[in-house]
Amino acid sequence: MDIISGQALLLLFCFILSCFLIFTTTRSGRISRGATALPPGPPRLPIIGNIHLVGKHPHRSFAELSKTYGPVMSLKLGSLNTVVIASPEAAREVLRTHDQILSARSPTNAVRSINHQDASLVWLPSSSARWRLLRRLSVTQLLSPQRIEATKALRMNKVKELVSFISESSDREESVDISRVAFITTLNIISNILFSVDLGSYNAKASINGVQDTVISVMDAAGTPDAANYFPFLRFLDLQGNVKTFKVCTERLVRVFRGFIDAKIAEKSSQNNPKDVSKNDFVDNLLDYKGDESELSISDIEHLLLDMFTAGTDTSSSTLEWAMTELLKNPKTMAKAQAEIDCVIGQNGIVEESDISKLPYLQAVVKETFRLHTPVPLLIPRKAESDAEILGFMVLKDTQVLVNVWAIGRDPSVWDNPSQFEPERFLGKDMDVRGRDYELTPFGAGRRICPGMPLAMKTVSLMLASLLYSFDWKLPKGVLSEDLDMDETFGLTLHKTNPLHAVPVKKRANIN
């Protein structure tokens, strides 16, 4: 929702509050002392600053403004000083050169409503011992190369189930909701790694849609522009309902987590012999954790699971949906990807994770999807812990820093034909998404790079390759590829507004 529309009267009332006028006068005095060194930006209105320029799609609004004011742009969003980064060079300064100074987070009002910033791997300051502990546990117990390799068979089985369900839909000549089936597959991969159970079922549409809608609502509420983020004294009002949505949806997820945690605790207490630790899942390892730091509380575990669950399911399923959307919109590109897969796998095989490295064009399709449809368009908001200089401009302490990776991915000075889906641009180039190339950083970079990146890349690539190998795809009757809906909804993540429906056609008889 637009942060101005629907609440204009209340914001106008706020304009005349004398206490706020005094506050803004004090703030403006601080800024003026270093004004010549600050990044350029658009003119500001009294009190609200540049909020009227944000709109429903901040990543697009900021990209347009950056064309005028440059790759390091200053905005005043209510009482919040903000700098928007929109070039690879500036992104390198933020994510690498000044990584330590700019690695703090700027939690949104929704996140603060459940004190998630005090226990979350995403929102805790990277300088804290708690963050280092959670990061270490996440990597060693879940996301290390060894752990990811150990769950390879699990991913293969879940993708086989996906292919089997789509095969049944093909037999019935039914279209498939790509968003839904991708989410279920990703959900079951994540839930098995975390809890050793399937949480989703392809044949339980109503129940699983509830989980998917809950996760998307959490991400939207956490990332949607909110008046309370810019006017802290408005927090108690929850003008746009983001706090209510965030609380209701996270509580719903936490109840699910707590059920599994309680069951595991009861199982451990009833066992006479210790369980084989090689069969432990992530929650088992967290419950068993003993370290130099204080032990993890159940609340700590719930907050960590909330991070893993929401980030791990929404981003991967959304990326697969965007990839399939672009391929259906560009049938020659889809045919080229399918021909490569058929050549490598053969006519009666099955796609294995080890095959992905032999599929450079498929890898290019995934990279091109991340370029055009980056899952987190502004990355997670950062906060300057001290003054920092970015490309000759001063970023003051406590300034919010947004890296507009969506804008960088569509910058004509960086990419030829930036609005076109052309995987060929990556062929023969040593460019990846691992945080080394600042033209393409969908997972961030530096100490704050998403630890789930390797798992996400394997999951998305395996699902996409399997769908393209097993089926030809066409749009529902009456829908033309050139008219395919590309509308998007902004939140902490960027997902397709209207789910993609496509009709699968079996490419070979032995699919089941």
Curated annotation (Swiss-Prot):
Gene Ontology MF: a single term: monooxygenase activity
Cofactors, names only: heme
Segments passing through the bilayer: 3-23
Annotated heme binding sites: 450
Lipid bilayer topology: Single-pass membrane protein
Keywords associated with the record: Heme, Iron, Membrane, Metal-binding, Monooxygenase, Oxidoreductase, Transmembrane, Transmembrane helix
UniProt EC number: 1.14.-.-
GO CC aspect terms: membrane
SUPFAM superfamilies xref list: Cytochrome P450
Pfam families from the UniProt entry: p450 (PF00067)
Localization of this protein: Membrane
Top-level division of the source organism's lineage: Eukaryota
Coarse class of the protein's main subcellular location: membrane
Family the entry assigns: Belongs to the cytochrome P450 family.
Protein name per Swiss-Prot or TrEMBL: Cytochrome P450 76C1
Phylogenetic placement of the source organism: Eukaryota, Viridiplantae, Streptophyta, Embryophyta, Tracheophyta
Gene: CYP76C1
